[in-house]
Curated annotation (Swiss-Prot):
EC number: 3.4.24.-
Keyword line: Hydrolase, Metal-binding, Metalloprotease, Protease, Virulence, Zinc
Organism for this UniProt entry: Diaporthe leptostromiformis (Lupinosis disease fungus)
Record-linked SUPFAM superfamilies: Metalloproteases ('zincins'), catalytic domain (SSF55486)
Cofactor: Zn(2+)
Origin: domain of life: Eukaryota
Amino acids binding Zn(2+): H461, H465, H468
Active site (record annotation): E462
Subunit structure comment from the entry: Monomer.
Protein name: Oligopeptidase PhomG
Role according to the record: Oligopeptidase; part of the gene cluster that mediates the biosynthesis of the phomopsins, a group of hexapeptide mycotoxins which infects lupins and causes lupinosis disease in livestock. Within the pathway, phomG and phomG' are probably involved in the processing of the phomA and phomA' precursors. The pathway starts with the processing of the precursor phomA by several endopeptidases including kexin proteases as well as the cluster-specific S41 family peptidase phomP1 and the oligopeptidase phomG to produce 10 identical copies of the hexapeptide Tyr-Val-Ile-Pro-Ile-Asp.
Amino acid sequence: MDLLGDQHFAAQQPPLFDATPSSLKEDAEELIAETIAAWDSIVSQIQTENATFLTFYSSTSPSKDLRDASTAVGRLFNDAEIELYSRQDMFERVDQVLQQQDKQVVASLDEESLYYIQKLHRRFHQNGCGIAEEGQRVTFKTKMKRLGHLVQQCNKNLNEDKSGVWLGLDELDGIPQSLISRLKQGDGENSDHLWLPTKVPFSSPAITNAKSEATRKRIYCAIQNRMEMNVPLFREIVLLRDETARLLGYADHATLKTADKMMQTPQAVEALLSEIRTAVAPLAAQDVEELLEIKRNEAESRGTTADELYFWDLAYYSARRGEAEKKISSSISEYFELNTTLAKLLSIIEHLFGTRFRRVNAAGRDEAAGSLIWHKDVQMYSVWNVDGPKEFLGTLFSATGEPPRPPTPPQSLVIPTALQGYENTDGSLFLASSALVMNYVRPTDTRPTLLSLDEVRKLFHEIGHLLHSQWTQTKYAALHHVDRDFVEAPSMMLEQFFWVEQHIKDVSFHYSHINSKMKDMWKATLVDQDETNPPEKPAQLSDDVVFNLARANQSKAIQGQLKEVFFATYDMLVHKPASRAALEALNLTELFNKTRSDVYKVRGGEALGEGWEWGHGQTVFRNILNRYDAGYYSYLLGRVFAMDIFDAGFKEKTTSREAGRRYRDMVYRVGGRQAEMKTMTDYLGHEPSTHPYLAWLQGTRIGDSGPTVAVPT
C-alpha cells in the first residue's frame, strides 16, 4: 500500500519552469525592486530566495535565448547585491544591534537569529561598509561589480564551449568502439577524421584508452588550452580580488575569505595542506614509479624505450595497472546502467534516512498548473518523511543526460537550491527545491548509458549535496547554506558507502536483466565480438568481484588527493601573494604548471622544450571561479571531516536507520544555522581528527584516535 496516497503537492506548490527571456528580466527587476523597498522601510525580511531559481536557466536550458537572458539576470542580481550590501544606512542599523550585546534587543534574540545578525554584519563589512572614506567605497563597489561580470563571462565561455580535436583513423587505436561510433565525421580536409569534443564524457574515455602517446598528448593539451579567451579574464579576476581585499583592510584575498570560514586563517589552511602533502608524498612517488614501470614494459614490448611519465600518461597507465583489475574494469560498467543505478541508490537512501522519493510522472505533473520541468527528459520527485508522521520535505529534479544543446556544463552540476528553505512568519516552513544535473552521454537505441566506477562515485557524491540542500531547515534563507569549507563533507561521507561491499553489490545490476530490449542490446555487443551463444551474465556482481572493487580504489585515492593538494596549493598561492607587486609580476600560467609538476612529481610540455606556458589549465579551473576562491582546500578538509563522520556514525553498521536519522537530524537538517565546527563536535562528540583520513590514505582503518584537525575555535 502506498503510504503517501496520490497527492504529490498537497503541502506546497513546486517551482514552475515556464520562464521566457523577457519574463526572466521582468521577474528579476521586480524582485530587486521589492527587496530595495523592503530595505527602505525595514518592515519585512529580505525576500531574495528566488535569485538562484532565476539564474538556474543559464546552465540548464536548451534555449540559447533563455540561457543568455538568465546570464543577464545574474548580472542584475550581482549588481543589486553589491548595491544593497554596501548601504551604510542598513549597515548602521545592523551594527547598532550588535553594539547592544548585553541589552534587551540582543537578549530577546534566539541563537539562530543572533548568528544570522553576526553573519549579516560581516557581509556588510566585506561589501565595503567598513571603508571609512566615501570615495574609496565607491571605488570598491565599482570594482566588485566588474569582478562579478568577469566571473560570469568566464562561466559563460565555459558553458558555451564547443572545443575538441580532430583525430585521424590511425590515432584511434585503443579508444572504445562505443565512443568512436558517437563521434562526428569530418568533411573536406577532415573527411578522414573524427571530431572528439573535449567535454569529459568524450575526452576521459579517449585519453584513458588511446594507445598512442601522441594522441593522448593532443587530447590532453586540447583540454588544457580550450579556454584561451579566459586567460586575461582570469588574471584580471585574481588582481581585482586582491585589490578589493586590500581596500577592506585585509592583507590579501585569502585572509579575507578564510576569516569567515571554519579555518579562519590562511596559515591554518597552509598547515593542513602541509600535513596532507607530507603524508601523500611517499605514496605518490611509489605510484608514479609503478606507472612508469608499466610504461617501460609496454615500450619494450614494442621495441622502443620510455624513461619518463607525463601528465597525459596518468589516466592511461592507471587503467593498465594489474591484469585482474583491468579485466574487472572492462565489464564493470555493464552492472551500472544509469537509471537503474540511480533508482537503487535512492532506495538505499530511503531506507537509511527514513524517506520516500516519489517519482512524479506526466499525470502527476498535471496536478499543478504551469511547466514543472524545464525539459522532457528531466525527472521530478516529491520527497516525504516516512519515519514517523508523514511529512512533505520538498521537491527534487534530476537531469542525468547530456543536455540537448551545443554548450556543455561541467560533468556534474548540483543546483542545490533552486528555491531555498526558510521559516514563514507564521512559523510554517517553506521547503527547498533542488536539482541535480549530470552531463552523462545520452543513451541511444542500441546502447544504454553505462557508468564507470568513477562516475558512480561521482553520482553518490552529488546526491550527497542534493540531500544536504533538500533536508536543511533554517529560520532564515540566508542560513540555508553552510560555510564553503564544510560544504563537501556530507557528500564525501556518502561516497564511503559505495566502497562498502554490501552496497556495491546491492546497487549493481547487469543491464541485460533490466528488460528484453536491454538484453537484445547486450547480445548485439557480443555479436560484434564474435561471441556465439554466450552464457547469461549474473544479475549482480559476485562476492569475489565486489571484494576486489571495495579495495581497488587505493591508487585512485592517492591520485585524487594529489589533484586536490595541487589545486588547493595553487589557489592559495594566487590569493595569498607576498605583496601586491609580487602578484602583478606573477605569471599565472607558469605558476599553474610549475606547481602541478612539483606536487605530482610528473612533467608536461616543459620536459619537451615547450616552456612553462605549454598549457593554461587555470582557465578551466571552474571551482576557483565559482565560490571556491581561496577555498579549494575545502575538498581536502571535507574528506578529513567525511572520514571522521563515517567512522563515528556508520563504520560498524552502514545500514543502521537509527544512525541515518541521527545524521539527518544533526548534520543535514542544521544547515548553516550555527557554526559548522559546533555541528561537527555535536555529532562526533569530540574535536575532528585527521586520523581516519590519514589511515584511509594508508589503506588502513584501525588505530588510536590520532591528532585533532588544526582548526581554530
